[in-house]
Design a protein with these regions (language model features):
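A conserved beta-strand/loop capping segment in the N-terminal third of enzymes
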Residues: 2-48
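Predominantly flavin-linked oxidoreductase catalytic cores and closely associated redox partners
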Residues: 51-187
Length: 187
């Protein structure tokens, strides 16, 4: 619960012809505190996951991966080459670390995936902004998320308004092959 900003219980989906479908979890599951769509901020989730990993024995390193050696037949053990910024200096110290397993949790344009030549895969690209609304408008989104479908917001994805801590996240996305089309929607 500590990472969840809002417990959304209502979803509105809006079609290209402006037809709306409203989904209420209360109508589906009855009024309960256990059924909701949890909204959280990425940085809060990341911090939670880092802290949880440390609690379970992981050694945290403030570093930037620069190269990954994948071992025989790309099956490991893996050698991470990285710049260690633990000292707080602006120039990291070059280090290596041998590991049995790598979890790349660094997003769609993953340095980790590129460094170990993970191959081509379909990637969705998202653009999102945080917008602070006046209290009245923010109250409207208290437990409501909206999704918009149609080529006016994305050729193959959707647009959204998701309520977060003290703002709404407004965004859209597309598959990487269409990113030039979606960039035309940016202001």
């Amino acid at each position: 619960d500590s990472i969840i900003d809002r417990k959304v219980r209502n979803m509105r989906m809006i079609s290209p012809s402006n037809r709306e479908v409203n989904i209420s979890l209360d109508k589906v599951y009855g009024k309960t505190d256990n059924e909701y769509i949890g909204m959280c901020r990425r940085e809060v989730m990341d911090a939670f996951m880092r802290n949880r990993a440390a609690e379970l024995g992981a050694n945290l390193v403030n570093g930037l991966v620069t190269k990954i050696e994948t071992g025989n037949n790309r099956q490991g053990p893996y050698t991470l080459n990285y710049s260690d910024y633990s000292s707080g200096e602006s120039k990291g110290e070059s280090k290596t670390l041998e590991v049995d397993l790598i979890i790349g949790a660094d997003g769609a344009n993953s340095r980790v995936a590129k460094a170990m030549d993970a191959g081509d895969y379909n990637v969705a690209i998202a653009f999102q902004e945080r917008i602070k609304l006046p209290e009245k408008e923010m109250n409207y989104y208290e437990d409501l998320a909206e999704m918009y479908v149609g080529t006016d917001v994305s050729p193959d994805f959707y647009g959204w308004v998701f309520p977060k801590y003290d703002h709404v996240a407004v965004g859209t996305g597309t598959m990487q092959k269409n990113q030039s089309l979606i960039k035309g929607l940016q202001v």
